[in-house]
Structure formats: structure tokens, C-alpha cells
Amino acid sequence: MDYTMEPNVTMTDYYPDFFTAPCDAEFLLRGSMLYLAILYCVLFVLGLLGNSLVILVLVGCKKLRSITDIYLLNLAASDLLFVLSIPFQTHNLLDQWVFGTAMCKVVSGLYYIGFFSSMFFITLMSVDRYLAIVHAVYAIKVRTASVGTALSLTVWLAAVTATIPLMVFYQVASEDGMLQCFQFYEEQSLRWKLFTHFEINALGLLLPFAILLFCYVRILQQLRGCLNHNRTRAIKLVLTVVIVSLLFWVPFNVALFLTSLHDLHILDGCATRQRLALAIHVTEVISFTHCCVNPVIYAFIGEKFKKHLMDVFQKSCSHIFLYLGRQMPVGALERQLSSNQRSSHSSTLDDIL
């Protein structure tokens, strides 16, 4: 197909509205709002079900009382907070904001508390793995439920503290005749905008991944000389943790960092602004997906957790049959008893994430 223009005809003649109007970074996204909303709904349902199921199993099974289980429970709770903000963001995509300024700040708070606490708990779990494998003797003293609870409370406090500067700038304002909930910075507040962007980059990526890298390099060095089945599974899972976290969070942080460079006029131009706006939305959707994948990575892969999940499922089925006045099939009952016995034998083993 020939895209050559006629002589003496400019791009403005072909696209007068685009070149005469101010640079609009959002126009590229308006046609995709409905698709984004559908995707957000799918992520909400999957994230709500997955993380709720993790919490149900961890709270419902009395055998899950290790420090790892405490971190898993808090990680699922942080992802659930993140998930609860999605319906409001979906509504904000399709229609104007009708929930008021206070709710605008609350929803943004849920989003960022979920974001920061999730990254912090991933980091804390990595440090816990590092202690358990590299410093096994010392870990016996510190890897207790009370220490895990205290550290979890500290993580939540740190996440709330990191969120407060971001919440301050969220407000409801009119955009194209519609009320929207978004971060609003006056021109003299550019330094605050850059501060919040760099805060997300530093606390949401650079610091956690520096700790992750150190922990997992030391873990792999420690495990290199003893590759039995459990050790091999631990190495694979460690690599999965690092790679998946990078895949989901690095793109968004890079796009946010480049946006900061554009605000500093290091990067400039209308086309650059439009590409960055599109990149922020696309990478944000990718990062949203992480709240659905976490239950798979940190829970469903674990053999111990899968056994307890099956126990919960079988017990639920037995209660349903009992409520209906029927008995469970003999084969299912035998499988349940066998599963309980295997679970009791394996409960003394330390669970590998």
C-alpha cells in the first residue's frame, strides 16, 4: 500500500484536529477504555477468588502456623486490598467519579498500601528464606510466629507511611466536563510529583530487588552443592519468584521513571508524551495481573499448601453431603482419610515457598 502524500500537502491537512489542538496524551486510550474495563473485571474476580481462597486455607487449617504461613497470609491480604480498589478504578474509566473526594483518597490508599505491602512482604519472605537456608542455626531462634507477627505489623506500618504522601494529592476534579479521581499537581508542585514517582521507583522496585538479588544469589550459592529433590524444587521456585516479579513490576517502574524524565524536560515532545501515557496504562495493567498470580506462585505451588487445600475442599464436600442428608462416596472418604494421614506425616517438614 502506498502512503506517499501528494506534493505540497502537509500532515496538518490530513489531520487538522490533531496538530492544531494541544497535545492530548489520553486520546490514544479513549477507544480502549471498554476493553480495559472488561480486563479489570476479570482481574478483580480472579484476584478476589484466589486471594480469598488462600486466606481461607491459611486461617482454616490449624496446622498452618509457621512464620512462612504468617507471611503468606499477609501477602494475600495485601493483594486483596489491591484487588478491592479495582472496581472503583473500573468505574472511573467508564464514567465520572460519583463517590466523593474522601472515597477517592481511600481507594487510592487501598491501591498503594496493597502495592507497597505486597512488595515488602515478598522481600520479607525472601529474607526469611535466606535465613532458613544460609543461616539455618540462627534462623531457629528468630523464625518464630511472634517474630513473624511483629515484622508483619512493621511492614503494614511502613506501607501506610509510604502511602500517605501519595494520597495527599488525590482529589476529584472536572476533566472534559466529567468528574474524575486522579492525582492533581499544580505547576509549583512539580517537585512533589517527582518525589512521589521516585518514591514508587525506590520503595517499589530498587530497594526490594536489591535485597531480593542479594538473598537469592546467596541461596543459590548455598544450594549449589546439594541438589536433592527438595533443594532442586527450592531453586526453581526461587527463580520463579524473581523472574515473575521482575516481569510484572519492572515495566511499570521504567515507564514511570521515563515519565519523570519527561516532566524534567530531559525527554520532550508531544509524541513522547503520548507514548509514555500509553506505556503507563499498559504496564499498569500488567502490574495489576500480579495480584492474581501471587496465590499461584506463593501458595498453590507448595506441596503442603495443596494438601491442605484439598483437605478444605473435601471437608466442604462432606459438609454439603451431610447437609443434604447423604453420605460421601466410599472412595472419596478413603481418599480424604489417606490425605489427612499424609498431611499429618508431612506437617513436621518445613514448607518451601
Curated annotation (Swiss-Prot):
What does UniProt give as GO cellular component? plasma membrane
Q: Which Gene3D superfamilies match?
A: Rhodopsin 7-helix transmembrane proteins
Task: Give me the segments passing through the membrane.
Answer: 34-61, 72-91, 106-127, 145-169, 201-220, 237-261, 279-302
Intervals, Extracellular compartment: 1-33, 92-105, 170-200, 262-278
| PROSITE patterns attached to this UniProt entry | G_PROTEIN_RECEP_F1_1 (PS00237), G_PROTEIN_RECEP_F1_2 (PS50262)
Keywords of the record:
Cell membrane, Disulfide bond, G-protein coupled receptor, Glycoprotein, Membrane, Receptor, Transducer, Transmembrane, Transmembrane helix
Instruction: Please give the superkingdom of this protein's source.
Output: Eukaryota
User: How does the protein's chain sit in the membrane according to the entry?
Assistant: Multi-pass membrane protein
| Glycosylation-annotated residues | 8
Q: Name its GO BP terms in alphabetical order.
A: chemotaxis; immune response; positive regulation of cytosolic calcium ion concentration
Q: Which GO terms describe its molecular function?
A: C-C chemokine receptor activity
Q: Where in the cell is it found?
A: Cell membrane
Q: Which cysteines are joined by disulfide bonds?
A: 104-181
Q: What is this protein called?
A: C-C chemokine receptor type 8
Q: What is the lineage of its organism?
A: Eukaryota, Metazoa, Chordata, Craniata, Vertebrata
